[in-house]
């Protein structure tokens, strides 16, 4: 049985995250969106959060109160942006947020980390963007 309560969603403003927000809303879930972009209409609450910036994450963590059903780490940036941003958002920020919210996830709650096929097949998919592939491989560990 799924835990009750709000779902924290990173990257819910665009792409896969926005599709996830729509599906969660359709299922009647309360969504707290963390993103650098504007809030999707499905979000019950929205916090501007730059996952490449630990102080931005800490600021949001200080505002999140209570227990949450799930943390869905969907936010990500492509390997075409600078390597520090790729690693910061796709791996280090995800870990920082997860570590910071861990004690607020319900006993039967879930943490889901969305990664790319590049973490499995990086030699075939992205040999020219190792800064993208490597963080995705790290998520598998």
Where are these regions (language model features)?
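Conserved N-terminal Rossmann-fold NAD(P)-binding element of oxidoreductases
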Residues: 6-12, 34
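N-terminal Rossmann NAD(P)H-binding glycine-rich loop of SDR-like oxidoreductase domains
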Residues: 10-24
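Flexible cofactor-recognition loop at the NAD(P)H-binding site
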Residues: 14, 66, 70-80, 94, ...
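Conserved glycine-rich Rossmann-like NAD(P)H-binding loop of the short-chain dehydrogenase/reductase
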Residues: 26-41
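Rossmann-fold cofactor-recognition segment
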Residues: 41-57
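Active-site Tyr-X3-Lys motif and surrounding loop/helix of classical short-chain dehydrogenase/reductase
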Residues: 59, 82-88
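Catalytic loop of short-chain dehydrogenase/reductase
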Residues: 78-79, 83-84, 103, 107-141
């Amino acid at each position: 049985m799924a835990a009750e309560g709000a779902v924290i969603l990173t990257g819910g403003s665009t792409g896969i995250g926005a599709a996830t927000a729509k599906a969660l809303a359709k299922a009647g879930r309360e969504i707290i969106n963390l993103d650098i972009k504007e809030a999707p209409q499905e979000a019950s609450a929205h916090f501007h959060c730059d996952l490449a910036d630990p102080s931005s994450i800490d600021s949001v963590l200080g505002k999140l109160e209570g227990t949450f059903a799930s943390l869905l780490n969907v936010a990500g940036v492509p390997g075409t942006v600078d390597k520090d941003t790729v690693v910061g958002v796709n791996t280090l920020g995800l870990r920082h947020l997860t570590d910071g919210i861990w004690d607020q996830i319900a006993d039967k709650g879930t943490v889901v980390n969305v990664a790319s096929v590049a973490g499995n097949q990086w030699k075939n998919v992205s040999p020219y963007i190792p800064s993208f592939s490597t963080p995705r491989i790290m998520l598998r560990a």
